[in-house]
């Protein structure tokens, strides 16, 4: 038997594995965030009621020292993550006096508001409240 023919089954197997792995790569499935202008407006209202005291009226000038939620700090802290990472963090830890007390829709709307203040534009498609679905949405610009 020719030496190259004895390698054929292994080569075919390795090629099949490579194709399957590349098809299952999560980063290939990531998209940019989707949200609506209505979500941004609802998010602005919710932000002003629940977040402004710590993070400020301009998202970077809070009275109680909350970190900036726009600009360089936001990009450096969240830019490599997903929308789901941001929403999951907010739901688990915000507001600090009673984390998780807001509705799923309110957290999602506030995230849409934050996205709109960090260079993302509404595209007319609702940002889903499901954090798993948001994990597929990259914050990388």
Residue ranges and their predicted role:
Residues 1-8:
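N-terminal secretory signal peptides that target proteins for export/translocation
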Residues 10-22:
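Bacterial N-terminal signal peptides
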Residues 25-46:
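Electrostatic cytochrome c docking/interface patches
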Residues 37, 58-95:
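Gly/Gly-Pro-rich "capping" loops immediately C-terminal to redox-active cysteine motifs
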Residues 39, 82, 102-106:
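An acidic site on a long C-lobe helix of protein kinase domains
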Residues 43, 47-58, 110, 114:
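The canonical Cys-X-X-Cys-His
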Residues 99-141:
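Flexible coil segments in periplasmic/lumen-exposed cytochrome c-class electron-transfer proteins
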């Amino acid at each position: 038997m020719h030496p190259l023919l004895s390698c054929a089954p292994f080569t075919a197997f390795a090629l099949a594995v490579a194709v399957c792995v590349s098809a299952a790569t999560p980063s290939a499935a990531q998209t940019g965030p989707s949200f609506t202008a209505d979500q941004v407006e609802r998010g602005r209202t919710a932000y002003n009621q629940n977040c402004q005291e710590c993070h400020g009226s301009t998202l970077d000038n809070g009275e109680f020292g909350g970190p900036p939620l726009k600009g360089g700090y936001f990009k450096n802290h969240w830019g490599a993550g997903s929308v789901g990472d941001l929403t999951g963090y907010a739901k688990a830890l915000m507001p600090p006096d009673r984390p998780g007390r807001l509705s799923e829709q309110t957290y999602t709307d506030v995230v849409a508001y934050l996205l709109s203040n960090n260079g993302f534009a509404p595209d007319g498609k609702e940002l889903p409240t499901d954090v798993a679905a948001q994990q597929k949405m990259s914050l990388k610009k």
